[in-house]
Amino acid sequence: MCLRRKLANAIRALSIDAVQEAQSGHPGMPMGMADIAEVLWREFFKHNPKNPLWNNRDRFILSNGHGSMLLYSILHLTGYKLSIDDLKKFRQLGSNTPGHPEIGSTPGVEMTTGPLGQGLGAAVGMAIAERTLASTFNKPNYDIVDHYTWVFVGDGCLMEGISHEVCSLAGTFGLGKLIVFYDSNGISIDGKVEEWFTDDTENRFKAYNWHVVSNVDGHDYRSISSAIKDAILVKNKPSLIICKTIIGYGSPNKSGLETSHGAPLGENEVLLTKQKLGWTYPPFVIPQDVYDHWNFNLQGVILENEWNKKFQGYYNKYPDLANEYLRRISKNVPDKFVDNFNKFIKELYLCPKNIATRVASQNVLEFLGKSLPELIGGSADLAPSNLTMWSKSKSIKQDISGNYVHYGVREFGMTAISNGIAHYGGFIPYVATFLAFMDYARSAVRMSALMKTQNIFIYSHDSIGLGEDGPTHQPIEQLSALRFIPNVNVWRPCDQLETAIAWKNAIERKDGPTALILSRQILCQIDRSQEQINDIYRGGYIVNTTVRSPKVIIVATGSEVKIALDVSNILFKKGILVRVVSMPSTNVFDQQDNDYKEFIFPRCLVHRVAIEAGISDFWYKYVGLTGCIIGIDTFGESGSSDQLFSKFGFNSDIISEKIISYLKSS
């Protein structure tokens, strides 16, 4: 057996042993891609196992994340803090080797992957981030940002629609440092893909403006190495390397079959496979000579030390740029940023305006853009509607050091790309579309929350208030759907002041995404005290604090807060005292201490009403099963905003009568 094959077989052996030990997992892909991984990681991949977060490391994304044991095996072999005992605990509760790669669980894992295609989208984001950051900070002889993004994908990734969205955009942007390996083994869970996947992948990607290296023997290290060298030479296009492989390579009875995809080989087949591969070692045993050839600790330290030396020279020559680079990579805001943001909010308080919250958001962006150069925005072909561009927005297509991405109509791809930009570092991304189209992107929003990504999602045209475009564009259930995703802070502000504070919360939050739900129609600014402004940060607060001993609480969000205040005035004239609560963020409110929640919603105040132009079921947690909810549980219609609010009962007189009836009946 040649040395190169022996090194690849170490990946195969560890993968089949771990899957067999766990009695679950996916051995076929690691067995099929082991030779590709050996060539990439030993000949080309730039990293430092001693410091997995070295800034100028290459990025590796396993988009076909079910083959996680391939990555875990490589990380163990190259010297990361991942032991044999960790591999033996593969897929076990509490281990750092979960079934699919999870960022934060395993050193060396750059991105949580599993839902096919999303890793590819994130990789496009990382390649965008690398190029944009490089164009901002690099100077002659000082390429402090200079590395590749490498991706493994399978048939499933390329069948997913997101692959079209993100690869089309990557080709348009000419991301020359993005190199993707396609594991073309012709097998998926259901069998041979020729029955459902007959795309001409080579010409598909050429049409995207990609460089394609086809017909690479995925089990011949010379062919693989030659293909990578070919791809590296192409600077103005991303590259796809199509590797012909055999799933379950080495298994006498399961290679080339779907039976090797997602289940242990079985004890007998493991023995037969190792015999065929010439692997004579017990389970989880790697000979020292294999470790010696795989270990990358020394080379990694040398690479990082060389970069540190270069960065020191850069720092000496360009100290301001170097400090700005370090600030951005460290995720620290600029000096005086918080003070300036607070001054900006105070100005909004002193100079009230009746404007749509999407306009208010754009005004905040005008302030943020001048204060936070790390802010990088984009919209799914709705910039004039979402209002996501500010006066100094620059398209990265026209200027690679720009700060704005025209994503085109690619909501899902846009969000996955934004996840990659966020995890790359040095940027705070925001992306936008209509709230009704959030459903296209929802899976990537969920991944953002799972990965604790600082990502900002702008969803405008937040209700039937968008008007004449009709029910296809009018969100009903989307707002609640977002709130139900764990770790997403959802804000639906009622005016420009709440909008600014929602943005401030999003910028300050480092452990998860924030969704800003914004109106198309003009909303009135509400009068508040400084104490009330402070309480906006708590997600929910009392708007009409002068009311003492109320009989009923009305809680509302967004455009319905003004309606709630009008209702309270009508009921006051009828002798009914009402407390109005604005709850711009139910998620943030739920995180408050029990005393504050009791202060807002005293248990003794059992008469409660919720008003929101969306699905009603969500609000029972606040008003109780006997509460009154004014919501919308059908789809909308085409008409003006005023007509629709009236038709669906969002009228202060109608709601007042409903509340009176509710109080009488209870």
Curated annotation (Swiss-Prot):
Signal peptide: none annotated. The keyword Nuclease does not apply. Binds 1 Mg(2+) ion per subunit. Can also utilize other divalent metal cations, such as Ca(2+), Mn(2+) and Co(2+). One of its GO terms (biological process) is pentose-phosphate shunt. Substrate binds at residues 26, 261, 358, 385, 461, 469, 520. Thiamine diphosphate binds at residues 66, 114-116, 156, 185, 261, 437. The record marks 26, 261 as: Important for catalytic activity. This is Transketolase. The gene is tkt.
